[in-house]
Amino acid sequence: MGFLFTSESVNEGHPDKLADQISDGILDACLAQDPDSKVACETATKTNMVMVFGEITTKAKVDYEAVVRQVCRDVGFISDETGLDGNKCRVLVELHDQSPDIGQGVHGMGTKSDEDIGAGDQGHMFGYATDETPELMPLTHVLATKLGHRLTVVRKDGTCPWVLPDGKTQVTIEYENEGGAMVPKRVHTILISTQHIEGVTNEKIAEDLMNEVIKKVVPEKYLDADTIFHLNPSGRFVIGGPHGDAGLTGRKIIIDTYGGWGAHGGGAFSGKDPTKVDRSGAYISRQAAKSVVAAGLARRCLFQISYAIGVAEPLSVHVDTYGTGKIPDSEILAKVKAAFDFRPGMMGKALDLKRGGNKRYQTTAAYGHFGRDEDLDIFTWEKVVPL
């Protein structure tokens, strides 16, 4: 019996994603100078304004305003027409040291070894993998994300000069369940809403989106005469970016992960250093789940881990292969526990998470944190661990 499932994505010019990239741009700047920086940086943006706020303890000397403006320019917010001008917008900075109460409990104010560093907070994180794509990611999520990325490519390379930074995509796929494994059959619906300049016709928008975006991304085998296309269905999307909607860090956590598949513990990633297990725990969980599927132990895998603040060892670890495991889940879990060290300090070391700079974390903040095999030097958690 087939069923429909939908995932969405947003472009790097969506205001929430801009906020994520700014928070991670600041994290990069801190870690580049001081790998032991403790960063919890949030960003809010609205018309002609960006505010960064939170807690940062670092030896780095960072011009936070300069970082904010550069990220805005990187994305393409360089004029009022785009929704924000990174060269002249107001930038508010409210950043203070990390609470010493947290510091003494987590890292002993810098005195604890990697083996003893505790989790930066309580929480539970998930990792997910599925054999339906080469990336071992859900196809709905992969296609929605790649459509959004392609929109940015055609904007920046001049193929579609009418495209502006803000945009959203959504893909619905018809699946069949084969003994717990997800098998995509066809694309049911594609939705694209992209910000555009004044004066371009809806006919031109639809033509370019079909020929330069959809046909360049979606494999022909998934499209048929019954596939539905909604291309800028509102009819007008000139006002966008932070001028159209306020943006906040951490509001696109499903887009950042698996597009609604698997599960999510609720914690966002951007602006957080590796002692924050919301981020490092989710990264190692993805690596664990991916390694299970890559090893052929299961066609589909969900991995969960949980922590207490200040405690190094996880409280629980769990594997669910949805009935697709070649061996019992308990045996798979034993293999995972033997191959991974889930203490926060050791996860950071194994995945080289203290290394920032060169837009490492800023790159993760748009177009998904997982399934990014194109650069394993950045996305170290996508490397498969032998089990």
Curated annotation (Swiss-Prot):
Residue numbers binding ATP: 14, 166-168, 234-237, 245, 251-252, 268, 272, 276
E.C. numbers: 2.5.1.6
Cofactor note: Binds 2 divalent ions per subunit. The metal ions interact primarily with the substrate. Can utilize magnesium, manganese or cobalt (in vitro). Binds 1 potassium ion per subunit. The potassium ion interacts primarily with the substrate.
Cellular location(s): Cytoplasm
The keyword Phosphoprotein belongs to this UniProt entry's keyword annotation: no
Cofactor section: Mn(2+); Mg(2+); Co(2+); K(+)
Family according to the record: Belongs to the AdoMet synthase family.
Subunit note: Homotetramer.
Name of the featured protein: S-adenosylmethionine synthase
Organism, as annotated: Ostreococcus lucimarinus (strain CCE9901)
